[in-house]
A protein has these predicted regions:
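Metallocofactor- and cofactor-centric catalytic cores in central/energy metabolism, strongly enriched
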Residues: 1-168, 173-176, 185, 198, ...
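A solvent-exposed, charged loop/short amphipathic helix patch at secondary-structure junctions
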Residues: 191-208
């Protein structure tokens, strides 16, 4: 509970509290943009309406309701029965949705709970945080596009720690360079001037995709390999040679197989020889690729 200073202190402290433990902040700033302060945590913001400096007929009501709300969250408790054999994280994007949906369907049939994270920056950050909190048994990282945004200054960067949590925690992971053919920007007018002349595609009115080039793919491939080389647990890399997104398949606006090959070759040349690399002459959204990804992660989980 607080005004400006108190709110920032409270929200900062709440970052250390694991997801699932109730968190509520009654604040005069609750109607402001506190995106950065809330971050990836499950924090409930409640407007105080009046200043919290003293008690009055309005503040008494709202403080009582805030106390009731947090008590209600605590009393809700946790599910008593485990409803799945394990939890698997999976990353997705519009360009990899068919793949992720099929993988999810197949894994659910095996009794797993599958949680999808949209690779728009906060999605990757949240997934990494939950992995570190021990929430997941394995990761099917289909869509690693946030690495490209971090490299090129796109709007979907998840920061430098993307693709590190599973490696540090030692849980099984199958990694795919999904959507590393693109960097995300807002409206066409927001694309930095340094990228003028590059291949751009308007995915939506306020979403512009930029095709990654060979030089960027060298950096991305090396970065991915170096992060995976530090894995404490089992990891495999799965490469769809005929397209790493919907728009890079044959006939797609980003179809540049020679540029994708630079990415594949760089990953393979920098990856620890003990880490298996499976190459498939299919697009990322084809059924055989989806089945292979699921088979790999299930085989790891059985060990």
């Amino acid at each position: 509970m607080g005004g400006g200073g108190g709110t920032y202190i409270a929200l900062s402290a709440m970052q250390a509290i694991p997801i699932g433990i109730p968190k509520l902040c009654l604040s005069t700033f609750a109607t402001k943009d506190l995106t950065r302060q809330v971050g990836i945590k499950d924090i409930v913001l409640m407007p105080s309406v009046v200043d919290v400096a003293g008690l009055n007929n309005i503040s008494r009501i709202l403080m009582r309701q805030a106390a009731g709300a947090i008590c209600g969250m605590v009393n809700a408790g946790k599910p008593k029965e485990k409803t799945s054999v394990g939890n698997i994280a999976i990353s997705m994007f519009g360009n990899t949705t068919p793949c992720v949906e099929k993988c999810t369907e197949l894994l659910k049939k095996k009794g797993y709970e599958v949680l999808a994270f949209h690779s728009i920056g906060v999605g990757g950050q949240t997934m990494e945080a939950l992995i570190r909190e021990g929430f997941f048994d394995a990761v099917l990282d289909i869509t690693t596009t946030e690495l490209a945004d971090d490299l090129c200054g796109g709007i979907c960067s998840a920061g430098p720690d993307r693709l590190t949590a599973a490696a540090q925690m030692g849980i099984p992971q199958v990694v795919v360079p999904g959507c590393l053919d693109m960097v995300n920007f807002g409206h066409l007018d927001t694309v930095p001037k340094r990228y003028q002349g590059r291949l751009l595609y308007s995915w939506a009115p306020d979403v512009t995709l930029m095709r990654t080039n060979a030089e960027e793919n060298k950096v991305l491939g090396q970065s991915m390999a170096e992060k995976l080389n530090r894995s404490k647990g089992e990891v495999a890399v799965l490469l769809p040679l005929k397209g790493i997104s919907k728009v890079s398949e044959e006939g797609g606006v980003f179809h540049q197989p020679e540029v994708d090959q630079v990415l594949f070759d760089t990953i393979k040349s920098h990856l620890n020889s003990k880490i298996p690399v499976i190459e498939m002459a299919v697009n990322i959204n084809e059924e055989t690729f989806e089945q292979k990804a699921v088979d790999l992660i299930l085989a790891m989980l059985k060990k």
